[in-house]
Amino acid sequence: MRILLIHSDYLNYNVKNKTPVAEEIEDAKKQGAFDESLVVFTAVEKDDENNPQGIVKNLVKEVIKTNDQVKAENIVLYPYAHLSSSLSSPKVAVQVLKDAEEALDAEGLNVKRVPFGWYKAFEISCKGHPLSELSRTITAEEEEEEEVEKKPSSWSILDGDKIIDIDDFKFENDQLEKLVSYELGTGASDAGEPPHVKLMREKELCDYESASDVGNLKWFPKGRLVRDLLADYVYNLVVDQGAMPIETPIFYDLDNEAINVHAAKFGERQYRTDTKKNLMLRFACCFGAFRVMADPFITWKNLPAKLYELSTYSFRFEKKGEVVGLKRLRAFTMPDFHSFCADMNSTLEEFSKQTDMCIQTGVDLDVNYEIIFRATKDFYDENKDWMYSIGKKIGKPVLLEILPERKHYWSCKIDFAAIDYLGRPIENPTVQIDVESGKRFDITYLGEDGKEHYPTILHCSPTGSIERVICSLLEKTAIELDEKAPMLPTWLSPIEVRIITVGEDHKDFANELYDKINAENIRVDVDDRDESVGKKIRNAATEWIPYIFVVGDNEKESGVFSVTVRETGEKVDMTVDELIKEILDKTKGMPYRGLPLPKDISTRINFQ
């Protein structure tokens, strides 16, 4: 927001004609005369739509601060579009000015607001002293930071049902200690490039696309496969939980009041479009799910109702300098699972189940999560026994944050975070209790009492964004490099088995083995190149392939192969049937997709 503050002897105005965006006004507001006034010429800007409440707070703060110095009898809010070339929507601008008028009035000031969207003739007499003409740029960030400082959260460790002061807690887990330090502002900074950025390129998963916006990636066949497998995995998880899959638009109209308020609550920077409509690219699937649920007739018998959408993509307009690798992007893939619950008991029961699901993803993905359990003080006081039961379920110490009051749409949430090589959290799964959106989006159900009620909503992402899952897996390999060979879980490895031929006359047999292994839904390829066996083995190792074996005369004759098992570093003699059984046992219950590349390495494109 841009403002120009004029301390004036008087301001007179007369309304002349409407513009297309003029607000409706009474005749009494078509003219005005104010003596001894601080006139605040205002232009609400496009960026202000991200957090209009923060803009109002800081505008009011600046006006009060200036008026304390000049001691004007009246405050006049005067909309003046000429202060900026990047204006907000008229709807947002009017609401900001109305809210500012109300807030200044609540402070005991004599405040008037000049009509928005009208051509006006005006006359003003500036007093001419050093403080009589001031220009300011109003943003929301300073006020948000100040608010946090005024009312800090309380932090402790929850270990089962025991609350332990952080200063008294003996950390046996350095990953939890790093998470605590980061959350309290004493941990690793966000400077430095994490190892996964190099690895995502080396392993031909993905890379930056210079012809696009920053934070938008291009995905190569191997990376696309890993993303798709993770998406399949989450789909299976949530459908088992009773979710109904949906698909909704990626664009939403910020002139829709419910969407505008929810977007402001979310607090992330958003992609906006410069069109006739005030459109925003979604930052999550919430809007779509809520609008789907606002239309049908729902009764208590239908609840809990669960909707799932994989957003390809969601968008957040992160600062250019903050965008890094797979961890922080402007376009990303987010599994969004929403549950609509009839009452708090049902909500807590579903929250517990979804916490179990998030814990299971850590096991299935072989990612170690550290956990932050967050709640408002009111929620904690009312539900502390239930929170302790969740602590026991988790089975290890977690960081507990108690907020003095609710600042967002949620009253309680649990966040799971992997820790990267540099000691910084990668936020992954989450479950959140939303106590606002049911009413805001007019989602109702008919209760057993015959009355309409608003449901409580659970937001859950069982893995977090797909990109951050891959980020976590790659960072884990860097952390454990001194302990074991880096690799992805077998079911996520783009190539699970590589067959290496000794010579040209072994290719037919290698192809027979390929056909047999491939028929069992195992991703297998053949290194048929005219290279030494040693070089082929080294190349397979750089691709982190879980199982490698060589086909020569002896193997062809005996049917027994010396298989290099990457996970253990051992060479194990086994038949093809034994190899197939081991892999199928290891990947049981996990999704499968076929090899995303030509089976013969000699025909492949190198994407890096």
Curated annotation (Swiss-Prot):
The gene is thrS. The keyword Aminoacyl-tRNA synthetase applies. It catalyses: tRNA(Thr) + L-threonine + ATP = L-threonyl-tRNA(Thr) + AMP + diphosphate + H(+). Its EC number is 6.1.1.3. It is an enzyme of class 6 (ligase). The keyword Ligase applies. This is Threonine--tRNA ligase. Gene3D superfamilies: Anticodon-binding domain (3.40.50.800), Bira Bifunctional Protein, Domain 2 (3.30.930.10), D-tyrosyl-tRNA(Tyr) deacylase (3.50.80.10). Belongs to the class-II aminoacyl-tRNA synthetase family. InterPro entries: aa-tRNA-synt_IIb (IPR002314), aa-tRNA-synth_II (IPR006195), aa-tRNA-synth_II/BPL/LPL (IPR045864), Anticodon-bd (IPR004154), Anticodon-bd_dom_sf (IPR036621), DTD-like_sf (IPR023509), Thr-tRNA-ligase_IIa (IPR002320), Threonyl-tRNA_syn_edit_dom_arc (IPR015011).
